[in-house]
Amino acid sequence: MNAAGCVNEEKKLPIIPQPLQSVYPPETVESKNSAPTQLKFAKEHDVRVEKYALDYLGNQDVGLINLSIEDANIDLVSVGVSEESYELRVLESAIEISAGTTWGAIRGLATLWQVAKQGRLNSGLSIRDEPRFLWRGLMLDVARHFIPLNTLRETVDRMSLLKFNVLHLHLSDDQGFRFGSKKYPEVVSEAFYSLQELKSLATYCMDRGVRLIPEIDLPGHVTHIVASRPDLAPTGRATDRTQKFGVHRACLDPSNENVFIFVRELIEELSNVFP
């Protein structure tokens, strides 16, 4: 999100990242009275917004949230910066969030979560915001250091609340191959993510406004693959698997037709898992 300051520069809101514009009421204005969180939608909405609000704000007792979403059918892959914009207003009777898309509404709810956690829900608070950058990503190298699925989900939770929108998962390298290929199980590491686990993680990410982007390293960085499939290497000889960091010589043979079959079928398998 844009790092521009508030209208009152001395009263910046404790929000990460700082919103594009915000107006904070005077100190004399008391915090809004707490009440059980309720949702009211002005029109048809994406069920993901409702689930997001209840998951993160259900126990915050922020009272009534009036949500207005202009177009709930825009896919996350297609959104631009302006489609993630939102406006948030705290009134005495309710909290209002208006957004052009599902994803803007989710960003607004993330801001509301941050404000509510710090007891700053004062009547008169208003925020207008949109991202400064289209790609706000985090890359995790699970090839060299396997990360349990539950930890990945917890990471996605925190990413979403801080308005990151891309999780780049580095699934393979010389030290490991974590994509649980059913077509080529011989190249898969002992610790890996099954296809169903990755599908589930992709859905979990999308429900929180985060795209899951997989990476399989080819034709280099393939020591782990060549150790099981020496027929794909230029030398035709197996390499020893390694956990050492650094430069490794293993690569796939571009003159070998079987390499193209291997790569094509692997990518087809990958594309069936990730939206």
Predicted regions and their residues:
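Acidic, contiguous N-terminal accessory segments
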Residues: M1-P131, R136
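Feature activates predominantly on carbohydrate-active enzymes
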Residues: L76, V81-P275
